[in-house]
């Protein structure tokens, strides 16, 4: 992996977290980062921007910084940094440390980030956030999910002014007509830059007297549990399968089994439908919902409250890179069953390292004879990975496209 970001006479060491699992061809920044850095540095050098470094002066806000490149570059401006991704947060943390922009200690990521000039907010926290002073500049890395962009623009309506410069950056293929329409709808007149290295900037000018729109999120739909009862499922903007039950989860619901005393992990939980279904099957089970998306975890929490509010104390909601957070605990939970529908994207890159790490972490966390149950497309051939790690896997159910595999820790 290329880790040396050399640009405009500066050099930063930047990694994609978790570094040890990344393909050598990947790096922690792209041309969209370079383009917005170049633009802002030009404005700063010509004194066309006035950005303060304390809460009572106009600030810089950064949204969706994939691996912390923008947060590190502009750390001297004490920006607010907003992300829905735990992995992005960990990347920012590691990169701030690598470039001596944060005090290293024996503390946790959260504790060390408190010493950083970069003020971090999760996407869930940012929904109710309002700075003391309107930001001078808002930089948005256009996300894959336009619903997330829509929610962020609605949130911004609460505190930006016509003097705020709203600048988005992204690959040309990400800057679609639909994305531009969102800026026009929620912010104001919108233009774009010329393309450079397959990236482009968006410039949106806030209208006078912006009124905050009503958010269309969370979206709500219903599905049937394994026992046939209706489950009410809410989905915040950046939640996988936001509009309907995905096919893999549907097959899992048809074939799930959970025992009364199980400690269940819903790994990569999304809206938590599998974990909520586990509570319907075994009301006394403990369920740990794990995801790297803060909106997913909040959706899962809402869905426990929607369907089994008296079981909320049996549930835990953990932001983590796969099962890393649980494995690093001094007192690890005695997990007997892990339910997993692995993703195969990290930000905009297609990768199989997430599935590998999920399976490896599951092997390490499960108690002896504990079970991992995986659903996935047939062509992903998860049975090969599971055989290497667990010694084999059994087909529990299948259709033309999907397969459910089960394996046990020996």
Curated annotation (Swiss-Prot):
It is an enzyme of class 2 (transferase). The keyword Methyltransferase applies. It comes from the Bacteria. It catalyses: guanosine(1835) in 23S rRNA + S-adenosyl-L-methionine = N(2)-methylguanosine(1835) in 23S rRNA + S-adenosyl-L-homocysteine + H(+). Pfam families: MTS (PF05175). GO terms for molecular function: 23S rRNA (guanine(1835)-N(2))-methyltransferase activity; nucleic acid binding. It is found in: Cytoplasm. The keyword S-adenosyl-L-methionine applies. Its main location: cytoplasm. Its EC number is 2.1.1.174. InterPro entries: DNA_methylase_N6_adenine_CS, rRNA_m2G-MeTrfase_RlmG, RsmC/RlmG, SAM-dependent_MTases_sf, Small_mtfrase_dom. Keywords: Cytoplasm, Methyltransferase, rRNA processing, S-adenosyl-L-methionine, Transferase. One of its GO terms (cellular component) is cytoplasm. Specifically methylates the guanine in position 1835 (m2G1835) of 23S rRNA. Belongs to the methyltransferase superfamily. RlmG family. HAMAP family: 23SrRNA_methyltr_G (MF_01859). PANTHER family: RIBOSOMAL RNA LARGE SUBUNIT METHYLTRANSFERASE G (PTHR47816:SF5), RIBOSOMAL RNA SMALL SUBUNIT METHYLTRANSFERASE C (PTHR47816). This is Ribosomal RNA large subunit methyltransferase G. It comes from Alteromonas mediterranea (strain DSM 17117 / CIP 110805 / LMG 28347 / Deep ecotype). The gene is rlmG.
